Amino acid sequence: MLKIGNEVSFKNEVGDIFSGELTEVLSDSYDDVRLRNGEVEYWSKKTKKYVPVREKHEDSVFFEIKTSTGLEYASFKEFF
């Protein structure tokens, strides 16, 4: 299960493999996102609560990972 502070490994778009600490979850589509119980949620202005990110918007979610060489960014698809 993904949690902030966990060690994660991912492969970027050119095939380089990185490992590091998951530090933040971000989104191009939503202003306020969080990681809870391994699921990304966003603040819904309509319902006034956090709700899971819809499947069609999963591509807008990415994660900040602190590696030994600096900060890297990865999507769900790049984790292994």
Identify what each model region corresponds to.
Residues D16-D28:
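Short beta-strand-centered aromatic/proline hotspots
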Residues S29-E39:
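Short, solvent-exposed secondary-structure boundary/capping segments
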Residues N6-V8, D31, F63:
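Residue-level detector of beta-strand structural context in well-folded domains
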Residues N12-V14, N37, T69:
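Acidic/polar residues in short coil/turn loops that connect beta-strands
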Residues G5, I17, S60:
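Short coil/loop residues immediately preceding or within conserved phosphate-binding loops
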Residues M1-E13, E21:
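Short coil-to-beta transition motif at edge beta-strands of beta-rich domains
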Residues V40-F80:
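Intrinsically disordered, low-complexity, charged/polar segments
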